[in-house]
Amino acid sequence: MANVVVIGAQWGDEGKGKVVDIYTEFADDVVRYQGGNNAGHTLVVGDEKVILHLIPSGILHEGKRCVIGNGVVLDPEVFIMEITKLKANGYLKDDKMLLLSEALHIIMPYHKRIDIAREKKSGSKKIGTTGRGIGPAYEDKIGRRGIRLMDLLDEKAFTRKVKEVLEEKNLILTQLLGEQPFTFEEIYEEYMKYAETLRKYAADTSLILHQEIKAGKSLLFEGAQGTLLDVDHGTYPYVTSSSTCSGGACTGSGVSPREIHEVIGISKAYATRVGSGPFPTELEDETGEQLRQAGREFGSTTGRPRRTGWYDALVARYAVRINGLSGIAITKLDVLSGQETVKVCTAYNYKGQVLTEVPASLEVMELCTPIYEELPGWNEDITGAKSMAELPKNARDYVARVEELSGAPVVLVSVGPRRDETIVLRNPFQLD
């Protein structure tokens, strides 16, 4: 029995979905603990491409229970669309295998309208929000004005709480943002329909997960976004609104930290970022475009082209420290095939000063330029490699150097998008 947290060790989009899909084989329950449908996990199963935004990747494995924890903000419309599509494709044959925490917060229509309107007004200072209402929903959660799933399922509580908050939301929409207001009736009619579907999935998931652990079951916690997008530890304010780091697995699920055995950080063999914010190793040249095209670096949620850059060892070390990583999974190593040389950022130059750690100040990080170590590349197609020995020497040397600079052992190397295009060096579910 082991309980494992999988988190993004960069700025999100690291390939967590594929790694979670592989690890799900060894878990009994897969838990999503933060974020909302601003995240997108792309999985390739056989010849089928599946994109999930809310439901844990474990849903593609029969017999695995999937849990959406209290730390998630849920858009009922998106959730229902996702389960409908999954069922149409032969997945989720038993509704009891998908649970929603009664304590999770619901994304309301005013959250989405406020989110989009604020971003429009921001002009050049845009954060890069997906416009899906995630941030405003978390604002209401912290401000104690949120609507939880348990409220949605209680008609009287829902009516009272929405009426209490709607006057304020309409003032913000009309007076500050120049947008149309909502009537209570339109929200009530729409969300009571959602309640009928969501009711069958609602549960005290913290208690159920506790019971699973006591019964000797293994849990896999599936993070969304990445360490540098964490609301506390990321490049604030260019962050998401939730706790993307490993600590969020406990607060977002109701599982004790004492029950976590392994934390695996997922990191691309290079780096990407979506939206605004500092990105020291960004490549705005032909090489950056080559990586974008070879890696198909376009957001699964927004379709936006991702910013690309070389691997940043400072970011990796930061992720190891903040999350307590016991291992790193390197994804998309195959994307680097064909590069004459590959680079790793080993330090930053800040006004002539050499920095070996990620600076706390956003203003400092924005002025940092990378100091690179250059390694020889490789031309071979590595997608068929089943072991490290089958990789070209230069590819092996690159992985070894990344491991050395990051400060945590590499436990998995992905050499292609398919599930079987993976080299597993250590299974975190098999404790020593």
Swiss-Prot record:
PROSITE patterns named among the record's database cross-references: ADENYLOSUCCIN_SYN_1 (PS01266), ADENYLOSUCCIN_SYN_2 (PS00513)
Catalytic activity: IMP + L-aspartate + GTP = N(6)-(1,2-dicarboxyethyl)-AMP + GDP + phosphate + 2 H(+)
Keyword Metal-binding: yes
Record-level Gene Ontology MF annotations: adenylosuccinate synthase activity; GTP binding; magnesium ion binding
Pathway(s): Purine metabolism; AMP biosynthesis via de novo pathway; AMP from IMP: step 1/2
Cofactor: binding details: Binds 1 Mg(2+) ion per subunit.
Binding site for substrate: 300-306
Subunit structure: Homodimer.
Function as written in the Swiss-Prot or TrEMBL entry: Plays an important role in the de novo pathway of purine nucleotide biosynthesis. Catalyzes the first committed step in the biosynthesis of AMP from IMP.
Descriptive protein name: Adenylosuccinate synthetase
Organism: Geobacter sp. (strain M21)
